[in-house]
Amino acid sequence: MESTKEKATPAETFGEYIFGDAAMKKYLTAKTYDSLRRTIDEGKQIDPEISAEVAEAMKNWAISLGATHYTHWFQPLTGTTAGKHEAFLDFCGKDGAIMRLSGKNLVVGEPDASSFPTDGARATCAARGYTAWDPTSPAFVKEGTLFIPAVFVSYTGETLDKKAPLLKSITALNTQTKRILKLFGTSCKKVF
């Protein structure tokens, strides 16, 4: 039996599983949206005041698409991808359970990196590392999991992934390109 509901075209569903502009506008207040946009567009640090609202919005958006878990997704130096999956479900004793993603858990994840593959790059006892959300790459939902793009660094600040050096390079190129453009009388907030 054929459904009476019309099938959506690829153009209508394009970007549906990405926490992009349309989802941000729908799930965030205007003030928080503007602050997050500045973070993304200008490479600014995320305002800690908005992290809880962004986390709640991202969680609600992901759940609406069938997600039950989230992971800080990164590319370690091993040439693979990695992430630790966490459930949104959080038990509350006698009261049952709630679905939760805190601002802190959105911004920083996995304080003990001993569970991540290293290809012998470090000893397990030196495995204290952190994932940090990279808001310049959009979060997305795939197969019931919210993937939060992240960088991976050691507790001493050493890069343990392939993305952090790329982001540093983009920042350096942006700074120098803006400097050169200024010499020619053009100013801008961001080039890349």
Locate each region found by the language model.
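Active-site-facing alpha/beta catalytic cores
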Residues: 2-17, 22-28, 176, 180-192
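Glycine-rich, acidic/polar active-site loops that bind/position phosphate-bearing ligands
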Residues: 128-192
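Short, functional N-terminal and low-complexity linear motifs
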Residues: 2-6, 24-26, 57, 139-148
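Active-site core of metal-dependent hydrolases
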Residues: 8-127
